[in-house]
Amino acid sequence: MRTHYCGQVTAADLDQTVTLCGWVHRRRDHGGVIFIDLRDREGLVQVVCDPDRAETFHTAESIRNEFVIELTGKVRRRPAGTENPNLVSGEIEVLCHTLEVLNASATPPFQLDDDNLSENVRLTHRVIDLRRPQMQKNLMLRYKVAMAFRRFLDAQGFIDVETPMLTKSTPEGARDYLVPSRVHPGQFFALPQSPQLFKQLLMVAGFDRYYQITKCFRDEDLRADRQPEFTQVDIETSFLDEAEITAIMEDMIRYVFREALAVELPNPFPRMTHAEAMRRYGSDKPDLRVTLELTDVTDAVQDVAFKVFSGPATSGGRVAALRVPGGASLTRGEIDEYTKFVGIYGARGLAYIKVNDVTKPNDEGLQSPIVKNLHEEALRTILERTGAESGDLIFFGADKTKVVNDALGALRTKLGHEKGYVSGAAWTPVWVVDFPMFEYDDESKRWVACHHPFTAPKDEHVELLESAPGECLAKAYDLALNGWEIGGGSVRIHRADMQSKVFRALNIGDEEAQLKFGFLLDALKYGAPPHGGLAFGLDRVVTLMTGAESIRDVIAFPKTQRAQCLLTDAPGEVDDKQLRELHIRLRQKIETQVEVAKA
């Protein structure tokens, strides 16, 4: 039907006759001539309908926004002064010869150039929303990124293998999405949170290098960077150690950015341990564009009169300082807003000191309600360690280590971007390595895996699995970019005895382990190779590349933060016949029936 895409007609096509199909983006009458901006996925082109062609002009008078049309016309140069440098086709226009309406359109629920729409409106009318040029650019970039991943992995000898979508529910990690079995009453499949165990089994089977771009499912509370179903670039390889795996993955990310954005990322990526990241940035995914850093002052305030500091400092907590250069100019109102902000992360307050004269480490040179409760030696140490200068402000966090890290880490990022404490680098990737193997869960009173229970401990820490699990480090690594974790992985356990030892450290006994993970333990007995891998969040990578506010802007049909699809009204009710076939009764309906019977 067409000879060209609208957005690809250029001055190279001058004097040619072209046939175009697309949507009417905008129609306007001007001096007896009708102008149509015709749109398809490649962009816009201006079409001119002259009254000299009466039939064509009459048809043009009847069309409205979002009508689908086909036209044939001649490409000509726009009159001088009317060019549009923002369009690929901005130097030319098409003089329309014939025009046919392929389909009319009802009045759209909103204009495509309306930037003030609520997300609910956009998601309810997602088909119309996806016609917006920015949304089409986002999804086209997503396609380019996915293809770049594939090209790189194909060239490196990785093979694409599909793994099951209906699998076994395991208790580790987030909640599973369960699928009832009709043919096995009372039993359930689970949708995979990741292909983790299957890709390990593929390594045991000898496939050496695997990848898959696949959907994963997690029934967890949603945030701006989370969805109940998300897309993962999943990778596993055999006979490579941690350094070799991360080197290949680093090359891959550089290749993807080069292909998709024509951007050169640093070579090599910086690396830091998890302990260093938490100490300096309060985060295991630090945004290195922000130049602010945390400074630990726990030891300096153990004997001060200010119990808010000395309490955590003497009971295993943390006291950290965040120096804000020139921050003494912050108003009381701004400080109050930052105090509210850290409260989101569990902080019970936000102490601060304004440094009016750094040469006077007392209430003469320092302005704060807390100065009188800190002795001069502590104040001098704080000023020296933070590198404070006159005119600066120092914020403090004092609490359990996790609360301090979460609160000051988030405040660091917020202050950095709001007040301009950022470097000139547009992209700051960083490997974070040597994660703790376990973390203690106060609610269940047991150790849980920081990554997952199939991660190998560092060789020199194997003996700590039983004696001091909290000190055991893992062969785990995450790749962070601009404050987002875009990928994470580890070297896996490839020996059955070691896997059983880790299960026991997690309070998973041999019988329970065999029941839940027997297929893995059995496979590891048959000559499993050393192996490891990594998974990248495709949605997150594309979100960063586009600068979108949410990953929902780079997914064609996303769920809301309440895990709903407003377009299809899912999840929804199903009829009783389907439930009976699945051997399911709804508790709410049963309770309602009982109440009716009692009445």
UniProtKB/Swiss-Prot annotation:
Keywords: Aminoacyl-tRNA synthetase, ATP-binding, Cytoplasm, Ligase, Nucleotide-binding, Protein biosynthesis. The gene is aspS. It is an enzyme of class 6 (ligase). It is found in: Cytoplasm. Belongs to the class-II aminoacyl-tRNA synthetase family. Type 1 subfamily. The lineage of its organism: Bacteria, Pseudomonadati, Pseudomonadota, Betaproteobacteria, Rhodocyclales. This is Aspartate--tRNA(Asp/Asn) ligase. Its EC number is 6.1.1.23. Aspartyl-tRNA synthetase with relaxed tRNA specificity since it is able to aspartylate not only its cognate tRNA(Asp) but also tRNA(Asn). Reaction proceeds in two steps: L-aspartate is first activated by ATP to form Asp-AMP and then transferred to the acceptor end of tRNA(Asp/Asn). GO terms for biological process: aspartyl-tRNA aminoacylation. One of its GO terms (cellular component) is cytoplasm. It comes from Aromatoleum aromaticum (strain DSM 19018 / LMG 30748 / EbN1) (Azoarcus sp. (strain EbN1)).
